[in-house]
Amino acid sequence: IKTKLSHEDAFSKYLIGQGAKINKPYGWQIKILSPESFLRKIGPVLEKRLTESKFRGLTRMLKMNFWKYELGLWFEDGKLVKVEQTSDAGRILGMNPYATIQLFLGFRSREDLEYAYPDFYVRDGLGELIDVLFPRKPGYIHYCY
């Protein structure tokens, strides 16, 4: 019997406790076509994570360099007020476009990605902030094939 459930839900944990086998999830084949739109959409989640951290009330702009373009995330008093492309050259957050999807979706941590991808980097002591905004979390993508 295949359950097609996350390994983190209560029922799956029960089945595992009864001796069920865990299959590795199939590789993620996800592409975020517009990181700008995606980050706007998850803005309330990012704001909640800030509120529950030492970064409550954050006011600053984060520049994410995606090789061909940069995105600026403007936070004011802990609220994400603007996400848009910027032309300013910045090399503080180097976002490998392929690896960043794993960060945004919680599949890999910032440290995992910095280790695996030399062109994924977080400088100027922003690692902890990125960890708060994009923590590693269990997830499951249901696929229908």
Q: Where is each model-derived feature located?
A:
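Intrinsically disordered, low-complexity, positively biased terminal segments
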Residues: 1-145
